């Protein structure tokens, strides 16, 4: 299956997910904004604000041998701002072959499962996930200081990991 023939994409794609009007749920978007602020548009890195459009991940995977996903994790049992880093292979979301599955309500982990099925051999092997612990997703623009500090830590980790200073 071929979705994109864009050869100008960076080798690394960084995708941030979240909803900035659901308080700390916007932390993935916050990280993306900070990365764009610090990096601009580097040649080898594509930075995407995915918002809540998880199924769009399918269109961002191709052409990027390395993918980094950033999102919030609710009710992790850890303090707000705690960072978890894991390979996407450790996250196995169940997918349904039901044609009535509402694509707009998919989460990115489910979208990854669909992408793996649809892309087959074109599915990137190197997908890392950064999750930032949160405990509040009420309707409110802005984030708590603890979530913001967690987001800042992820930005710094990514700048180191991507060897960008």
Locations of regions flagged by a protein language model:
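N-terminal catalytic or cofactor-binding beta/alpha core of small enzyme domains
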Residues: 1-125, 129-134, 141-152, 159-165
